[in-house]
Amino acid sequence: MAITMEAIKKLRAMTGAGLADVKKALTEAEGDMDKAKDILRQKGQAIAAKRADRETANGCVLAKVGDGFAAIIALKCETDFVANNADYIKLTQEILDAAVAAKAADLDAVKALTLSNGLSVEASVTERSGVTGEKMELDGYNVVEGEYVCAYNHMGRNGLCTLVQTNKPAAEQAHVICMQVAAMKPVALDEKSVDPKIVEEEYNVAVEKSKQEQVQKAVEAALKKAGINPAHVDSEAHMESNMAKGWITAEDVAKAKEIIATVSAEKAASLNMNMIENIAKGRVNKFYKESCLLNQEFIQDSKMSVKQYLQAADKDLTIVNFKRFTLVAD
């Protein structure tokens, strides 16, 4: 049967599929609109299955605040060409709108929601995959429940969005802190919010680093005392290349190796652990300052912390929650 242009336009509007694909599906379905939609959907599923191992490094990330509920979501794809497509962005927005309206708790709940096309979110993403020929997947679903939430959408190549919740109305300050979260990548709200395992790991790493530094200082001092430049013997490769250049002799290398082995062992056995632990604690405090939102230097004035900035606006103002998602690994 002849396929009318009206039918083609209608199916394209319903699915977003290409002209050739729509015409082929309608022809195969003998003009049956529902069958043609199923054919296009099956094509999308086949494409998605074939490209399951592809990397989805691009996409669209959006954030939205609703009635007592805010969310971030990402619809990821393979190329920025697809990510920048108006229909692709529109689909991401519709998924986010549905998630916020339904106050979906997690990504599985989002996937089960029904969109305006009558399909589930999951089926709609698969259908769009068939249209574009690229693998697509949902990711980065973060939610904040309650009042006084601000959303920040940074529309750039890194696909970055943030949510910040304050304990009272403070739209201006919340927006500024949204940008702080975007730029400074905090991992926790304050010291109490950091996972104890992370703190323990940071402390242990700091202890080992401090030990190595003290041993290295002792070794360098001993080498200099022996008339050997520490930079010439800091690795086997440097020793070999510096001998070839005539900067040091084989005797210098032998002497340096003996000094390094002896002094390293002696210093490691006699380290002042109280000093080491104090240095490590200082490094953990630095970690807090860099990684905890309220402790961070305020991006607009490094002389104050985020906490001080908030209290300057209102002594009772603080942040109670924040979320951040980006397509680019930090």
Regions found by a protein language model. Give the residues of each.
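N-terminal assembly/interaction segments in proteins that build large macromolecular machines
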Residues: 2-330
